[in-house]
Regions:
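N-terminal Rossmann-fold NAD(P) dinucleotide-binding loop
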Residues: 130-131
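Glycine-rich phosphate/adenylate-binding loop
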Residues: 269-296
């Protein structure tokens, strides 16, 4: 059995590899070559265990991602099994893996939904996950400028310095959230329970990756974003109905029907066209799929 540590994953996995793997995962889902089960939660006192599983026939593997949140700390592991024999092939420490595949999912959505000419980014959030979100978007579009909003000015400045150096792109911290919305591509990667992005701020042609919330209690954008969007997509409709706070809230208010929400796999595989004009506003709601972990 192979055991990979966080350091191993950091040294071995590149963003181009993560992007290729996640695109492969979405294509496999589209043609029935892969299955991916939604996240499940088990609670004990103040701790929680989350599990999600997936299989891919052509790779001959299935896998399980399990992670705990206890005593203020999260721990992630992915187990890979031989689908023919059931043998445990690998156990992988998966915090970095999860960060990379989450960023890559937004990168693939951007590749297929953002305007080809998109060159500016606005990002809300400056934490661990924000790094790979921006790296992935910069890998699929030629980005010239990034505006960054965070509720912490110190974190915002630190993020701008770090990422401008690693990506060789100009990053500009902004004090007001509306200022970050003046961009071709928007990324929300926060844990906010109240919207940080308003639909009134969106300009025609914007693509939004909303990747911060996988809890029904979280809402990164308001109802007006959904009203203005021409095309809504998610990594999983079933998972969205359990975890996408923005969608669930809008459905409960009668502002959204689930039929409007399409799965990204159909766009990636060419069965569905997402963007139909340069003025369309497109949205990808990312919740995270086990198949992304298994294939990556």
């Amino acid at each position: 059995m192979l055991y990979l540590t966080e350091q191993d994953v950091t040294e071995l996995l590149t963003m181009p590899e993560a992007l290729a793997a996640v695109e492969q995962a979405f294509r496999a889902l589209a043609v029935g070559d892969a299955t991916s089960e939604s996240r499940r939660r088990v609670r004990a006192r103040d701790s929680v265990l989350m599990t999600m599983s997936a299989a891919m026939d052509s790779l001959g593997v299935f896998g399980l991602k399990a992670y705990t949140v206890a005593a203020g700390k999260a721990r992630f592991h992915v187990s890979l099994y031989d689908a023919a024999t059931g043998e445990l092939l690998a156990l992988i420490e998966a915090d970095k893996l999860g960060q990379m595949r989450t960023g890559a999912a937004s990168g693939i959505a951007t590749k297929f939904l953002a305007r080809e000419s998109a060159e500016t980014v606005g990002i809300y959030g400056t934490g661990w996950q924000a790094q790979s979100q921006l790296e992935a978007v910069c890998a699929v579009r030629k980005i010239s400028r990034v505006t960054v909003f965070s509720r912490s000015a110190e974190n915002c400045e630190r993020f701008c310095q770090q990422m401008s150096h690693s990506l060789s792109v100009a990053l500009l911290p902004v004090a007001e959230p509306e200022a970050a919305a003046d961009a071709d591509i928007l990324i929300t990667i926060t844990s906010s329970r109240e919207p940080v992005l308003k639909g009134a701020w969106l300009r025609p042609g914007t693509h939004l990756n909303a990747a911060g919330g996988n809890s029904i209690l979280r809402r990164e954008f308001d109802d007006d974003v959904l009203k203005r969007a021409s095309f809504l997509t998610a990594d999983s409709l079933a998972q969205s109905q359990m975890e996408a706070g923005e969608f669930v809230t809008a459905v409960e208010k009668g502002l959204l029907k689930w039929e409007r929400v399409q799965e990204l796999r159909h766009v990636v595989n060419g069965a569905m066209r997402g963007r139909k004009s340069d003025d369309d506003i497109t949205l990808f709601k990312s919740l995270g799929l086990a198949i992304e972990d298994v294939v990556t």
